[in-house]
Amino acid sequence: MKKFFYRVQNGDGLLALSEKFSVPVGVLISLNNLTADLAQGDILYIERDERMRIYTVGVHETAESIAQKYCTTPEKILSDNAVDYLFYGLKIYL
């Protein structure tokens, strides 16, 4: 697990930082107790698990079916990715 701090730059957003550091948006939010938009100069704590992978949701897949395949819970998948539901083509972190 790689752990470090990052200073938010002008134009940074949660989605872009999530992709840049391969960390789910939900994890960034919870690690940093975020309740508002990011501002330039904010310091974020980043924990990146190199084992984490990006997964594209397939046709007719649900959080439950994906959770069963990857030995996790639907709640964790939804929470880590800061979404209420999954849909075809959505890229999520597992």
List PLM regions with ranges.
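Extracellular LysM carbohydrate-binding repeats and other cell-envelope/extracellular binding modules
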Residues: 24-56, 73-94
